[in-house]
Structure formats: C-alpha cells, structure tokens
C-alpha cells in the first residue's frame, strides 16, 4: 500500500527511493510486525483474561500441564493481524503470490478461530468436528493449489526442485495440484499438533519462515537464481516481505509465549502459521527442503499417526507413552523447557541443512 505512495514521492524526492528496495521493505515489514505484537500483547492478554478465554488442559496428559489451565489463549489472532497489516503496508499489492499467501493464512486462521471459539467460548470441548475442519482446510488448500497451477507463467513454477541435484527439474503437471494441496493442509495440521508446549511450535516456525524468506529472495532474483542453479520465478522475491512479517510477529509473540507462557496462540495461530509456511514453500518450489527443515513437525505428525494406527492394530498397545512426540519425552521425565529447547536446536540444525542445499548441488 505504501509502495504506491513512495513510488510517486520518489519521482520528486530521491530519499523515498529507498522504499523501492526489497531488502529495506522486508526489514521494516519485520519491525512493523514485531512492534505491533510487542506493544499490543499486554492489552490483548488482559482482554482475554477479562473474557475468561482460558486454555483447557487434558486430564490424561502430563500432570505438569494442569497449572496451565486458564492461561489466556487465542492470542494467535494478534500474530495474524500484525502479519496482514505489515504486508499490506510494505508489500507490492500487485503481486499475486502475496495475495495467495495472505488469503490462505487468513482463511486457515479463520478455521482455527472457529475451533477455538467453540471449545473455549461456547465450552464445547470437541470444537469443530474433525470432518468439518478437514473439509474446510481441503477446500481452501485445493483452491490455492489450483490457482497457483493455472496462474503459472513459467514451467519452473510447476516443476519439482530436488535438493542437491543441479538442473533436475521434473515438471509435475497436474500432480503439482496434489502436492501443493498436501503440503498446505499437512503443514497446517503439523504445526497445530506441535503447538503443545510453550513456544515449541512458534520458534521453529520463525526459523523456517526466515529460511523460506532466503529461498524466496534467491528464487525471485535472476542473478542469484542463475548463480545457484535454482529455478527463477518472477515475483517470488516479494514473498520475502511476508516472511519477514511472519518472523517479526512470531518473535514478538514469543516474548509472551515462552516458558512459562503468559498467553497461547491457539488454533487460530497454529493453523494459520502452518498453512503460511506450507503455501510459501510451494510458491518458492521448496517442498522437499521444507520437509527437511520442518523435521520436528514431521516427527510430531508421524508420532500421532503411528500411535493411533498401532493402537488399533494391536488392540490397545502403544508405541509412545503419549502422542504427539513432545508429550512422550515429558512423561519420560524431561522438564518442559528441556524438551522445548532441544526441539528448537534440532530445528536450527535442520534449517541450516536446508539452507545448505542452495549451494550444495
């Protein structure tokens, strides 16, 4: 939004030309989101407390979680709002990728909000039914995948980038839609499953969001794309503004969400942020690298699938003490902060491995 104004002003005042630089707009996008979340979170926490919007804790979970009961939740609304405001202010609103990512993020957050609202405000412990939630996610994910496929202007936009291999870009054809759908929907639910401890999902989301921003910048820059032997996608660089806003908003919220958390982001935050990472990975053609960098999300999801499947097949036996995986380690005696920080460290290592694929080809 401000880009249009600064473009006009730069014709008369040279100082405004700095706003034309993607790197500058990305930095101020992150700072805008960070300041918004840091400054508004205390008021939001007080407001949520006054509404008695408190987290409900499972009785069959780790006993250390019982003290979390009543902690304000649904704070993820502020993360999403800060991201949207920041991107609308500093992003190029003529860029189709920006709009797809924004709309998917907001739509999945709306699903999370409906689920939180039913569970916490309406006191319906089940929230949205699994079928209703998955149906809504599927519709949005499929629409985004179909749009990205049919709006593609180059073959690179629908090709599969295989890590560590140079100039190997198999065109997916219609299978692109299937892959994009599963990445978006799967990512949303994986982050949601991981969001069970204070800051556990948020810091990995921030780290992966920053890494995807690097991929977006290099993919959208003809010189760097050619130098690194990765596909060049015109317009993908603008996604850095979104990734920067996500990083800023995430870090701002983590100030209050870190152990012991003063507020939780709820499904409204985790579903939206997970979808944001998924659709961003699709846009910059890094689905496989995202699978690597999001190894914690993958492990958490697989632990649930394996636990449920084995429980049904074995007649009541379990692989893990409890799923998702972070609860298994808690029940083994790991203090919550140790689980959180170790998962962060693993994600940091995986993100570095993901970034290394830019050069190791």
From Swiss-Prot:
It is a multi-pass membrane protein. GO terms for biological process: cell division; cell wall macromolecule biosynthetic process; cell wall organization; peptidoglycan biosynthetic process; regulation of cell shape. It is found in: Cell inner membrane. Its EC number is 2.7.8.13. Keywords: Cell cycle, Cell division, Cell inner membrane, Cell membrane, Cell shape, Cell wall biogenesis/degradation, Magnesium, Membrane, Metal-binding, Peptidoglycan synthesis, Transferase, Transmembrane, Transmembrane helix. The keyword Cell division applies. The chain crosses the membrane at residues 18-38, 73-93, 97-117, 135-155, 168-188, 196-216, 235-255, 263-283, 288-308, 338-358. It catalyses: UDP-N-acetyl-alpha-D-muramoyl-L-alanyl-gamma-D-glutamyl-meso-2,6-diaminopimeloyl-D-alanyl-D-alanine + di-trans,octa-cis-undecaprenyl phosphate = di-trans,octa-cis-undecaprenyl diphospho-N-acetyl-alpha-D-muramoyl-L-alanyl-D-glutamyl-meso-2,6-diaminopimeloyl-D-alanyl-D-alanine + UMP. Its cofactor is Mg(2+). It comes from the Bacteria. Its main location: membrane. GO terms for cellular component: plasma membrane. GO terms for molecular function: metal ion binding; phospho-N-acetylmuramoyl-pentapeptide-transferase activity; UDP-N-acetylmuramoyl-L-alanyl-D-glutamyl-meso-2,6-diaminopimelyl-D-alanyl-D-alanine:undecaprenyl-phosphate transferase activity. InterPro entries: Glycosyl_transferase_4, PNAcMuramoyl-5peptid_Trfase, PNAcMuramoyl-5peptid_Trfase_CS. Pathway: Cell wall biogenesis; peptidoglycan biosynthesis. PANTHER family: PHOSPHO-N-ACETYLMURAMOYL-PENTAPEPTIDE-TRANSFERASE, PHOSPHO-N-ACETYLMURAMOYL-PENTAPEPTIDE-TRANSFERASE HOMOLOG. Belongs to the glycosyltransferase 4 family. MraY subfamily. Catalyzes the initial step of the lipid cycle reactions in the biosynthesis of the cell wall peptidoglycan: transfers peptidoglycan precursor phospho-MurNAc-pentapeptide from UDP-MurNAc-pentapeptide onto the lipid carrier undecaprenyl phosphate, yielding undecaprenyl-pyrophosphoryl-MurNAc-pentapeptide, known as lipid I. This is Phospho-N-acetylmuramoyl-pentapeptide-transferase. It comes from Coxiella burnetii (strain RSA 493 / Nine Mile phase I). The lineage of its organism: Bacteria, Pseudomonadati, Pseudomonadota, Gammaproteobacteria, Legionellales.
């Amino acid at each position: 939004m401000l880009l249009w104004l600064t473009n006009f002003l730069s014709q008369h005042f040279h100082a405004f030309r700095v706003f034309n630089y993607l790197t500058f707009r990305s930095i101020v996008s992150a700072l805008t989101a960070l300041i918004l979340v840091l400054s508004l979170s205390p008021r939001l926490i007080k407001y949520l407390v006054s509404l008695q919007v408190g987290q409900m804790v499972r009785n069959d979970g780790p006993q250390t979680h019982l003290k979390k009961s009543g902690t304000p939740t649904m704070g993820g609304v502020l993360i999403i709002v800060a991201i949207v405001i920041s991107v609308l202010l500093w992003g190029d609103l003529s860029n189709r990728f920006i709009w797809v990512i924004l709309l998917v993020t907001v739509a999945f957050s709306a699903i999370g909000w409906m689920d939180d609202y039913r569970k916490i405000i309406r006191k319906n412990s089940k929230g949205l039914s699994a079928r209703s939630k998955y149906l809504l996610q599927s519709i949005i994910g499929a629409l985004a995948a179909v749009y990205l496929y049919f709006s593609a202007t180059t073959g690179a936009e629908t090709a599969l980038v295989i890590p560590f291999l140079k100039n190997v870009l198999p065109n997916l054809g219609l299978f692109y839609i299937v892959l994009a759908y599963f990445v978006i929907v799967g990512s949303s639910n994986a982050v949601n499953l991981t969001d069970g401890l204070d800051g556990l999902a948020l810091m990995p989301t921030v780290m992966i969001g920053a890494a995807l921003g690097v991929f977006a910048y290099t993919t959208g820059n003809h010189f760097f794309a050619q130098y690194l032997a990765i596909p060049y996608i015109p317009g993908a660089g603008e996604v850095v503004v979104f990734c920067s806003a996500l990083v800023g908003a995430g870090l701002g919220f983590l100030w209050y969400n870190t152990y012991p958390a003063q507020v939780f982001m709820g499904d409204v935050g985790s579903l939206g942020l997970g979808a944001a990472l998924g659709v961003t990975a699709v846009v910059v053609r890094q689905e496989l690298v995202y699978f690597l960098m999001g190894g914690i999300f993958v492990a958490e999801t697989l632990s649930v699938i394996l636990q449920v499947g084995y429980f049904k097949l074995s007649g009541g036996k379990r692989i893990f003490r409890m799923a998702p995986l972070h609860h298994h380690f808690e029940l083994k005696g790991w203090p919550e902060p140790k689980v959180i920080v170790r998962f962060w460290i693993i994600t940091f290592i995986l993100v570095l491995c993901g970034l290394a694929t830019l050069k190791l080809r």
